[in-house]
Amino acid sequence: MSTRLKQITESKWMDLLGVVTVVGASIALGFHKTVIAGLPIGILSTVGAAVSMMGTRWATKRKNWGNAVGVVTSVNSAIVDYFLGNKAAFLTYPVSLIGNALSFFVWSRKGDRIPRTLDRYYFAVAGGAFALAFGLNYIGFTGFLQHGIAEEDLSKFWVTALITGITFSGTLNMPRMYADTWVFWLVYNSLKLYQNILFGNVAFVAKYVFYLVNAVMAWRVWHFVRKTEPLKP
C-alpha cells in the first residue's frame, strides 16, 4: 500500500491536477483580472500560484527544483500580499526566501535525500520561527513601531502572524528534511481551507483541499522512505 501511495504521490498526473486546480480556482473567482495601483496583481498571483504548486510538488518528490522555485515565488508572493493588505509582507517573505535558499544549498549537497525523524533542533527552530513571525508582523502592522496596531487590523495581525509562524516553521525546518515538517503544512492548509469555507470562496476551497491532500500524502510517503531507506550514520 505504501509503495502504491508513493507512486501516486510522485506521479506526473498529480502535478498536472495541482496546477489545473490552482489556476482554475483563480480564474473561476475572476481573480486574474485584479489590478491594484496599476499592477496586474491578479495575473501575478495566478502565475505565482501555478509555479508555487510545481515547487510544492517537486519538494514532495524530494527534488531540489522545488526549493529553487520557492526562492523565486517568495519575491512574487511578497509583492502580491503587500498590495492585498499584508503590511508586513516585505519583512516576512525574506525569511521564506532565505529558508528556501538554505534548503536548496543543503539538498544540493545530499546525495540520498532521505527524510529524518524529529529531534530537539526541530522544536527549537519551530519555537524560534513563531517568535520571529509574531515579531516581524508586529513591526509591520505598527508602522515600524511608530504606532499601535489599528483596531481594524487587529484580527488580520493575529491571523497573519499565526499563518506566518506555521510557514516559517515548515520552511526553516525543510533543509534537514524532517518527515514531520509536512505536519506544519497540513495545519496551514487546514486553516486556509477553513478560512475559505467561512468566506464562501468555493474555488479556493478546491485549491486548499488539494494542498491538504498533498501534505497528508507527502507526510505518509516521507515516513515510508525514512523507514525503508534509513539515513547513513
Regions picked out by a protein language model, each given a short descriptive name:
Residues 2-61, 98-100, 106-233:
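Polytopic alpha-helical membrane-helix bundles and their juxtamembrane interface segments
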Residues 50-78:
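Long, highly hydrophobic alpha-helical transmembrane signal-anchor segments
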Residues 66-67, 88-90, 181, 203-204:
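Alpha-helical transmembrane segments and their helix-entry boundary regions
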Residues 68, 83, 198:
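Short glycine/serine/threonine-biased micro-segments
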Residues 72-111:
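Hydrophobic, ordered structural segments
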